Amino acid sequence: MDFKNIVIASAANDCTIYAAEELKKYVRKVSGVNLEITDVKPSDGCFFSLGRTAAVSDGDYGKMISALNGDGYYISAKDGNIFLAAKTDRGLIYVAYEYIEKFLGVRFLTAEEEFVPRERKIVLPTEPVAKTPLFNMRTYLTGDVFQERSDADFIAKTRTVDLFTESDEAHGGRLTVYGRNCNHNFHNYVPFEVYGNDHPEFYRFIHVNGETLPTVDITNGLTESGEVDEKKEVSVVKIVSEEIKKDLAKYPELEVVCLTQEDGPYYFDDENNEKLAAVYKRSGILIRFCNAVIRRVNRERAAAGKRPVKLMTFAYDYAKEAPVKEVEGKIVPIDETVVADENLIIQFALFCNGFYDYFSDKQYPFIKKTLKEWRAVAQDFWFWGYDVSFHRYLAYYDSFDNIEANVRGMKKEGITYFCMQGPHDTRKIWQNEIRAYAYRKLFYGDERSAAELTEEFIDLYYGAGAESVKKLMNIFHTAYKEAEAAGKVVTCENFGTHERAEINPEKMLYSAVAAIERGEKAVKSAGESDDQTQKLLKRLAGVKATPLMLLYDNFYFYHPEGSK
């Protein structure tokens, strides 16, 4: 087959052009074929057709995308040509990368490392490939896709779509979701510098991650029945509504606005809040407030002939307990005022014991209880999970066996945005690089198992040292399962037992160090170039840091006489 062209639309936007250029680049790297990008159907040679082009009829293209949702995509072949289709601009990027990975064999491992096979031919798919993401938005949150440390190309390559890092037009463009400061933003919608002097009653100052910040009284401006008190000229609920309208005027494409409590356990508290919390719980106070805001905003939009928008808020920390009660064995809302409006999204943000998946019978009971009870008062959910110990990034966090269960479980729960929190402020934690690879693939419906995906990453990323990494992981996993069987508590979380001596015997840690040292020897004798050898040794050093850190942290537990 003589491939010569990539056909795009004559008025192709930045997104399509980027996708075509990426396809051209990787076809050349893998096969040596240098394709020309054109907007004219070629008269000779085979071609790729990317999106709606002169090479495909509107009717045929409509059939290709008819069963797709969101950023889904479709790949097919006809008469020796390859057709790449999607419903969205972002989907066209994803379909290009799907072909690059599935048919050319390229693997995007990290923002700094990719695997590119050589001397392969351009492959025609024998059967159509159609994929739709499991979640409308999805991210495994590590530094390579997060804000100032992120890599725009890698965000696109991993099909990451989240709230945290805005993409330019070439990489998919602005999302239809927005919140000031992204999250934890009550105070951003009632600016203290604007209202603080005239209305000090709106605010309390609280401690948030080492800072002192204002938060606001979300009961201010509501009647006892949870409606907006129109007699009050200025109130928190009216201000928030007006500020959201400003955001919608600035970004008319928005579909969801994020309005969420400040981080941590503190909130505005006074006699009125205490009285209402005794009846509705803190979560009920939150729902009543958010209902009032989004209903007010959407009433005005309806009057102006505009579509409704949604509001997202957190079921997090002090507000994670659902505003429900039990009546004759059934979970029911406390009353109708705490039933979430149809345009109110609830985002769970629940810490767990990462040694078990979120849906395991061995998981903390409050998680299953929380998920069940919130369904009595709301219908639209996002989920922010945690796959990290913020206290010790390098401690062995044994959650590899839970990846598939977490992804499948969230899909079954109807979650539409799944954010799995890793170490967002660094790219360099070896365990999370592996799990991120598997999670990101599964988010988009990869047919392989999480175990196959983690093994693929390790083999490609660590080269001759791969078996030593697998050995270390097996050493830790075996030790933790034996500790569990012996009745010890195994927890992977902030300050979990995975950091401690009781489930990390000194002898086990030294055996883990020895495993990596054998890997280092294997790398040195593998005959790689000096640069590649040093790269692999540096990666293994990052893995070896885990048992070394645990030996250091727990030295006095192993050797209480050590200070002598």
What are these regions (language model features)?
Residues E36-I65:
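Short, well-ordered secondary-structure micro-motifs within conserved domains or adaptor modules
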Residues K441-K564:
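Catalytic domains of carbohydrate-active enzymes that cleave complex glycans
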Residues S235-K238, K245-A249, P365-E467, K471:
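Structured mid-domain segments that build the active-site/substrate or prosthetic-cofactor binding neighborhood
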Residues A277-V293, I331-Y356, A438-R448:
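Acidic, His- and aromatic-enriched active-site or binding-groove loops in soluble protein domains
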Residues C290-K325, F381-V388, F418-Q421:
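Aromatic-lined carbohydrate-recognition surfaces of secreted/lumenal glycan-active proteins
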